[in-house]
Every structure is written in structure tokens, then in C-alpha cells.
Amino acid sequence: MNIAKLAFDFDDRFKDVFTNNVKTVNSISVEKDVVYNDTLPDVCTLDIYCPPLKGRDKYPVLVDVHGGGWITGDKYWRRGLNRAFADMGLCVISPNYGLSPRFKYPECVSHLFACFKWICDHAEERRLDLDNVLITGDSAGGQLACLVLAIQNNAEVKARIGAVDSPLRFKGGMLVCGAYDPDSMAKNIFSNKLFLEMTGYGRKHLREFKDYDLMNPVNFVDKDFPADVMVAYGRFDAFVGGNEKILFNRLNELGIPYREYRAKGAGEHCFHLWHY
């Protein structure tokens, strides 16, 4: 039994009752399950949330990467959040990506880069402003979003993971409750099955995984990391509490400015799903 998967699934479904099914924004148009990678049409789909243009020529774009511990989760569980983002004037693109154990990490990262290429290929017809693109993600999605920001200008790493290149470059983003520190997560006994499905290695042998370095996006944060990033976290996050510290330390070391948000109150994992 994968306790971590059960916990992530329960968290999505529990919050869904109180948020996604209650809060709606009627002015937002939604296009669901658009295939962005023809080689994996059952996996690589995205939803698009667009507000009225209201006289503008193009939409600023936000890519939202869902969480779920790399082994579960779906864009479906972020539909309320994405409607709220779209109501702020953004065109929100919410992709699904390959989950473990079917896809071993970091295949999911290459899927996201295929999504970014799709955005570039369809920017003109969908009136997307490629000079004004942000990324956000929570939990595993926060880790993936952070890695994307760290390697978007790193051709060597992108080639290593088989990621297709595109001219899309994110100007910044919002990282929420990101799982940046695999060493910290490996101390939790319930992470063993998660890591086995994700990498083929249990928590005690995780460092033997050939792509272990890619699990920690902080390893790739350099001077090219965008300065317009907010890092949000909860005080009592049972899953990834304290993971934000290694990212803060690296950004401070490089002198890269960032915005920090610590959730008020309990500040549980993915607290933001309650607050839109």
C-alpha cells in the first residue's frame, strides 16, 4: 500500500468538496483536454482557462503545474484555482504530465517542455503574449516549476532529459509548498513507496538513482534564475515542511531577490487551495 499516494489523493478530494465545487467564475471560458503531445495523447493533455480580452491584444500567460507527489494528481483538482487565476486577467494553461510508476522521473519534466513548445506553436492563434509568461505549481508541481525555472536556459540539462527546446522563457512565478529537498523527504518512512515508484529506489538508497541531482532543483539554480519569484510555504506542512529553506539559502547566496510568503494560521500543505 502506498500511504503517500493515499494521502495526496485524499487531500485533493477533501479540498475539492469545499472549493472547486463551490466557487465558480462564470465569465471564464474553459477548453478541456487539449492534446499537446501527439505521441502520448492519453497523458499529455492540458486545460485552458481564458477571461474576456477586454480590449487587450494578447493574454499574459500562467502555466499551473499540479502536485501529487509525482505519482498521482490531475489538473482536474485545480480547476477552481485556475478559474480564479483567469479571473485576474491571465490565460491559464494547466497541463497533465506522466506520473510514476508508468513514467520514471524525470520523464515528467520532458512532458512539461513539450507543453511549453505547444504554447509557442499556438501563441498567435490563441493570442498569447510570449513576453509575459509565468509558471506556478504546488507540492511536486512546485518542485517541477522550480526546476523548469532553473534549467530553462540550460541546454545541456534539457538535452540530458530529452526535453524539446522552445523559445518560451518564464519571467517568474509562484512556488507553493514545493518539494525541493529529497534528503529531507527521505527521512519520512512513508516516502519509501513513493520513491520506489518514482525512481526505482527506496528512500535509503535514493542517492544511487542516476538522476538524483535532478530531484533537487536547487542544484541548478544559478544567476539566470528569474528574480520575479514568490516562494510560499506553510508553518505546519506535514509533507515538505522546511523545504523552502534550501531554496532561500541558494537565492541569498547568489544575491537573487525573491518574495517570501508564509501562510497565516495553521499553514498546512497546499494551504492556498482554501484561499481563492
Where do the language-model regions lie?
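Alpha/beta-hydrolase superfamily serine-hydrolase fold, recognizing
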Residues: 1-276
